[in-house]
Swiss-Prot record:
Subunit structure: Homodimer.
Protein name: 2,3-bisphosphoglycerate-dependent phosphoglycerate mutase
Any matching Pfam family: His_Phos_1
Listed InterPro entries: His_Pase_superF_clade-1, His_PPase_superfam, Phosphogly_mut1
Family listed: Belongs to the phosphoglycerate mutase family. BPG-dependent PGAM subfamily.
Organism: Haemophilus influenzae (strain PittGG)
Active site: H8, E86
Site, as annotated: Transition state stabilizer: H181
Gene transcribed to yield this protein: gpmA
Entries under HAMAP family matching the protein: PGAM_GpmA (MF_01039)
Amino acid sequence: MELVFIRHGFSEWNAKNLFTGWRDVNLTERGVEEAKAAGKKLLDKGYEFDIAFTSVLTRAIKTCNIVLEESHQLWIPQVKNWRLNERHYGALQGLDKKATAEQYGDEQVHIWRRSYDISPPDLDPQDPNSAHNDRRYANIPFDVVPNAENLKLTLERALPFWEDQIAPAMLSGKRVLVVAHGNSLRALAKHIIGISDAEIMDFEIPTGQPLVLKLDDKLNYVEHYYL
């Protein structure tokens, strides 16, 4: 069986080189075109889906909608869940990546961005931009909503959704599309493929490119490739 991952199209803050994380930003025109191209590619390759999973962030939701529309499948059920959100970049969210490197040093910023288990500084829960002040997370316990994450914590947060929603859907015979974010998809790919803590640092997923994970009937990894 096949599982298709798509990272959202190029966003406004990708274009501005800002740390985004859980901040809710829109797609650029380039991002819209990437999503359209992904949908057309899926249509041309004959990919059909029974259900789509995405995050609760606009850039992923819009990408999912565009992909499904272009592949003539906008009617299928979509499940939106915060566990597929991008990695939370803590107090770095909204900061310019280059300016942050100049302030803290390239090495420190590289550690925050690429270390598997070291998180950036926490975002104050009282900050106006904190997820604690966003009603889309109102039903999540206060101590469960992150203030900063590394990739390890992102995987720990995303894994229950894989186990409770995505994997059961696939095992029941449903054809699944997941449209999410660079780090939430990398985290899930790490689990599915069996990528080591060291190797995952160099495993990248480009925006708007369908990644196909081929699995056996017990969801054991076989191979992966881009369309």
